[in-house]
């Protein structure tokens, strides 16, 4: 595996610094290197963008060519195999598409135009510069960073690593490689009652993203009542925790955080780990100072209505006649 999108630049990255350009490489340089090394697959991973703060969020796989023809043969099949492994909608709400409804496009059809790069090993027509080479593969927009809760999740390296693991599972299936024998758990821990309210945290209503992530919580993973792993949640308002390299079986959780009660009720859950899969958990804890809403008034029963005020069940009509005298 070769990583091609960056040189070894400084860390942390400082925009406008004198060594800023050490991070970036020209797309043509990347394409030439891919061709020269005769790679089996090329993947370029990104995040997508819509309007800031919008609820749009879904992945898109893009290969060089049209919707009906991949110009680097095998690219569309690679993307199609990868899609079902990458799809994740438990912790990251998706606004469209589905595990059985993929979003896989040829770049020329998707963007509506193309150009040709004349390389040392051939001419390559497409739209995306990073795909203008002869190696099959795709560009992946994994999520929308303009969906603000997803952006907060992406601040957690373990969440990002899980995206890479899901992509790797698709690669293994495509090439018929041996799958992993262990599994993973990824989850979130959030407040049971308090919603997050912030101008930079616009979430999809009625999803788990509405609840306040518990910064700094400690999540213990238990197997047969014994703590086997511990995860320290970061302070980036995502509530993410990840447990790696787990033997298949059933696991439970403990959450420790000052000002919060232990897990109870529906949140004291058991999760089953399976080989070569990631299992998901959404945990919620109640604050120790939580006070249930006070009932300010009661809905009293309707008073009994006297029978005389009820609507009649029968009406009787009688016709009367009269003689009137007209004057004049």
Where would I find each of the regions flagged by the language model?
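A short, solvent-exposed beta-strand micro-motif common in secreted/extracellular proteins
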Residues: 239, 249-259
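Short, acidic Ser/Thr/Gly-rich low-complexity loop/linker segments typical of extracellular
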Residues: 208-215, 222-240
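A short, amphipathic beta-strand motif
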Residues: 183-192, 283, 293-294
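Structured interaction patches on ligand/partner-binding surfaces of diverse proteins
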Residues: 258-290
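Catalytic-core regions of hydrolytic enzymes
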Residues: 1-57, 61-73
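Periplasmic peptidoglycan-binding/tethering modules of Gram-negative envelope proteins
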Residues: 288-328
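Active-site-adjacent mobile loop/cap segments within catalytic or ligand-binding domains
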Residues: 44-52, 62-63, 98-179
């Amino acid at each position: 595996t070769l990583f091609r999108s960056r040189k070894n630049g400084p860390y942390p990255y400082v925009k406008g610094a004198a060594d800023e350009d050490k991070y970036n490489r020209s797309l043509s340089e990347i394409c030439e290197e891919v061709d020269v090394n005769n790679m089996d697959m090329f993947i370029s991973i990104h995040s997508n963008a819509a309007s800031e703060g919008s609820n749009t969020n879904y992945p898109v796989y893009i290969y060089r060519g049209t919707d009906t023809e991949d110009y680097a043969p095998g690219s569309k099949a690679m993307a199609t195999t990868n899609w079902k492994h990458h799809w994740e909608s438990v912790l990251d709400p998706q606004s469209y598409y589905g595990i059985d409804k993929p979003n896989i496009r040829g770049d020329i059809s998707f963007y509506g135009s193309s150009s040709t790069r004349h390389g040392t090993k051939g001419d390559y027509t497409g739209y995306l510069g990073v795909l203008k080479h002869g190696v099959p593969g795709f560009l992946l927009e994994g999520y929308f960073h303009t969906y603000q809760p997803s952006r907060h999740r992406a601040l957690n390296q373990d969440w990002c690593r899980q995206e890479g693991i899901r992509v790797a599972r698709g690669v293994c299936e495509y090439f018929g490689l041996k799958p992993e024998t262990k599994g993973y758990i990824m989850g979130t821990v959030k407040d049971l009652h308090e919603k997050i309210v912030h101008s930079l945290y616009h979430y999809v209503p009625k999803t788990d993203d509405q609840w306040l992530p518990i910064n700094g919580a400690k999540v213990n993973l238990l197997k047969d009542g014994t703590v086997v792993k511990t995860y320290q949640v970061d302070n980036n308002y995502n509530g993410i925790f990840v447990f790696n390299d787990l033997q298949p079986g059933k696991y439970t959780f403990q959450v420790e955080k000052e000002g919060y009660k232990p897990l109870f009720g529906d949140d004291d859950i058991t999760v089953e780990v399976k080989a070569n899969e990631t299992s998901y958990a959404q945990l919620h804890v109640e604050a120790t100072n939580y006070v249930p809403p006070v009932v300010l008034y009661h809905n009293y029963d309707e008073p009994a209505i006297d029978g005389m005020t009820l609507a009649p069940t029968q009406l009787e009509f009688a016709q009367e006649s009269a003689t009137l005298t007209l004057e004049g």
